């Protein structure tokens, strides 16, 4: 059975691992390199802090039989700049990504779905769709349009987002590559 619960700072390691997995870091490809371990450790600390992009306060966990199996990180896009300023200076792994000159991923009026990831053993079972629908519901409750970025070279993710009703709104350069910006307006 799938249930959801708000994350807590005690979930920081799970959050960090799955944020990095969403960014295609291969966090389930063992053995982990020193770079991946360092990024995981640094991001874990960021996830414990309030008012960061990946803070536990912005995260929802999907549980399967009571165990964490998936992650959603989403927040009011009007706070993106504040959260970004509190996040990237703490992460050496992003030092070469020009985050200071990167355009904002989100803005006022958006409920930004920053990260969505499912542990490998739970993929293909509808958990990602359940998390995405939870995010869309939260956006509606907040009276904001739901937005996200997706790697255009990720056809399964593009199909999932399209099937839920997300529409392509253009492209955005972030973290050294182009992403598609998708949204649902209510």
Task: List where the protein language model places each region.
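Conserved acyl-donor/pantetheine-binding loop and adjacent beta-alpha core of acyl/acetyltransferases
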Residues: 76-111, 115
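Active-site rim helix/loop that mediates acceptor-substrate recognition in acyltransferases
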Residues: 36-59, 63-64
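Conserved GNAT acetyl-CoA-binding A-motif
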Residues: 109-111, 123, 139-151
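Conserved acetyl-CoA-binding loop-helix of GNAT-fold acetyltransferases
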Residues: 118, 124-137, 159-163
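Conserved catalytic-core motifs of GNAT/GCN5-like acyltransferases
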Residues: 77-79, 147-150, 162, 167-181
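Conserved N-terminal entry element of GNAT/NAT acetyltransferase domains
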Residues: 1-10, 30, 186
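Conserved GNAT-fold acetyl-CoA-binding loop/helix
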Residues: 24-47, 92-95
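Conserved beta-strand in the GNAT
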Residues: 61, 67-76, 112, 117
